[in-house]
Every structure is written in C-alpha cells, then in structure tokens.
Regions:
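Beta-strand-rich extracellular passenger or scaffold domains
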Residues: 1, 16-19, 275, 307
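Leucine-rich repeat
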Residues: 207, 224-229, 241-244
Length: 329
C-alpha cells in the first residue's frame, strides 16, 4: 500500500524496443505502482503497440530525464500516452492492489523528446477527490503527435513550463474531471469541495496542425464542470478548474482551432501570451478558429495577450478574437 512496495530503483541508459513494428501485441515497456524514488534517465523507449512506454500509479519521487520516446504503432485514436501518470483504480490499473487511492506526487519529467507517439505525457482517468501533486513537466520536446501532447487531470501545485510542442493536433489540456471518472471507494461526501489547482502553464511554444484528430484542436485548454446533481456513481460537486496561471506561451494555429480555451473554470489568469493564427487557404480542423474562448467561467482575467493574424483563408468565420459564452463567462 502507499509508496512502500518498490523503492530506490534506477534505470540508466540503453534502448528498449517494444517490437510494435513487427508484432501486434500490447507491450507496455515499464510499469510499476506503490513505488518511491524511481529514476529513469538517458534511455530510448521505442516501438510500442497500442500501449504506453512507461506507466505508473501511486508513486512518489519519480524522475524521468533526458529520455527519448518514439514510434508508436497501433490504433490512432486510442488513449496511449508515452508516459502515463496513472490513477490507481482496479478497473483501470489491473494487478497492482492494494487499491487504496494513493495519488502520485513529486513527479519530474524533464529534457525528454516525444516523437511520432500517439500522445505525449499525462493522465486521462481520475478518482473523485484524488489529486496528483507537484507534477513538473518542463523543458521537453513533442514532435508529430496526433493526439494531446500533455494531458493533466486532477493535478495540483504543478507546473507545465518551457516545453516545445511542434506539429501536434492539440497541445496542453488541464482538467479537474475526466470522461473516465471513477467514484471513490473510500466514500466521498455528497458534494466535493472546491479545489484550487495552484498550478502554472507558462513559456511553452505550441504549434497546432491538422492530424485528422477526432476531437477539437486547441493550443491550451482548461476544462471543468459544476454538477448540481449526482450523475451515475459520481457525486454532485464542483469539478471546475480554479487557480491556474497561463502566461508567456507562444501558440501558432495552422488550422481552424482554438488558441486558449477556458471551459468550466474560475479565477484563471491568462496573461502575456502570443497567439498567431496561420489558417491556410484550405482550412482544416473542427473548432472554427477562436483565439481565446471562454465558456461558463467566472472571476478570470485575460489581459496583455498579443494576437497576430497572418491567415491566408478569407473565410472570416474561421477566426474570432475573444469569445464569451454562457451566463458566467
């Protein structure tokens, strides 16, 4: 239980090939849970098939530095991050009980390259009331990603900074809920408390292109929701994203997409970002080209941002400046 099973482990150097180019078997390369003090550095992990390269849950003090993740094979629309910072839930992370809802904390991913993988790094499932803390994703390169580069679900006190995201379908999503949202087996109160994320998304360079992505394209999205009543097994509660600072990012939109998108948020600061719209003559994408989109959000400030429009497409419906939608926008 907790972080007590695997301790003081180092992987240093070398290449591990998942052989996904030759065989259609799911092949996660490194997987662990209930762990502490794990270091993975100077490695190349390549050719996974419909799987993650590294997957872990209920871990603390994990450092992944100067590694290369490349060449994913398999279903293009699957939820396979090269590094999955996972939620320890029995239906979602099998064979690693005790399922005590231990979150991840003190996770550092730096100086890594993600190229030709389905997704880069992050978390796509969540347990109500379980938050991962002090997650640092900094100084990495993401190249040719057909899904998200970074997906941060239920993160607090975390930072996503100084990353280069090039030729990707979507850049960074930060959310306090998930489509795959599980109830707490410990038993939560009927209403979840409002949580301030106290996190930063800063100084990232993001280029969004058409990857025939099944969802909407965007540079940065913050996503949450207020549920006034219970839905299935999920209790009613405030699942909105609060307290995130978004500043100093450079976002280039090379298809009809959103630059920065706030949906179900509160007290967000969006400052001093540069968004360059470069929609081509034959526009692609599903979102209609809005620089900053705000839906059902309150108490946020958007100021000091620069918008540059060098688009060659003359359809004015494809680009809007700041769009406010909803009673609290």
């Amino acid at each position: 239980s907790g972080y007590t099973v695997f301790k003081n482990i180092t992987f240093h150097g070398g290449t591990i090939d998942g052989q996904g180019a030759q065989h259609s078997y799911k092949s996660t390369i490194l997987r662990f849970a209930h762990a502490s003090d794990v270091t993975i550095e100077n490695m190349t992990l390549t050719n996974t098939y419909s799987s993650h390269s590294i997957e872990f849950a209920a871990a603390q003090n994990v450092t992944i530095n100067n590694c290369v993740f490349s060449d994913y094979h398999g279903k293009a629309d699957s939820n396979n991050e090269a590094i999955q910072i996972e939620t320890l839930q029995r239906d979602h992370f099998a064979s690693y009980g005790k399922y005590d809802e231990t979150p991840n904390r003190n996770i550092t991913i730096t100086n890594c390259t993600f190229k030709n993988v389905q997704r880069g790094v992050g978390t796509h499932a969540a347990i109500v009331g379980c938050y991962h803390s002090n997650i640092r994703i900094e100084n990495n390169k993401f190249i040719n990603i057909p899904g998200y580069a970074i997906i941060a679900t239920n993160y607090i006190n975390s930072s996503i900074k100084n990353n280069e995201i090039t030729d990707c379908a979507s850049g960074i999503i930060f959310r306090d809920m998930a489509i795959t949202l599980y109830p707490s087996e410990k038993g939560n109160k009927s209403k979840t408390p409002k949580i301030s994320s106290k996190s930063v998304i800063a100084n990232n360079k993001i280029e969004i292109t058409d990857k025939k992505y099944k969802n909407v394209n965007y540079g940065i999205q913050l996503l949450g929701e207020y549920r006034s009543k219970k839905k299935g097994k999920i209790p009613k509660g405030d699942y909105r994203v609060y307290g995130v600072q978004v500043y100093g990012n450079e976002i280039t939109l090379k298809n009809a997409s959103y630059g920065i998108w706030l949906n179900g948020t509160g007290k967000i600061r969006v400052n001093n970002n540069v968004i360059n719209m470069q929609v081509p003559k034959k526009a692609s994408g599903k979102s209609g080209g809005t620089v900053v989109r705000v839906i059902s959000s309150k108490g946020s400030r958007i100021n000091g941002n620069t918008i540059i429009n060098t688009s060659k497409n003359k359809n004015k419906k494809l680009y809007r400046g700041i769009e406010l939608i909803g009673k609290k926008a």
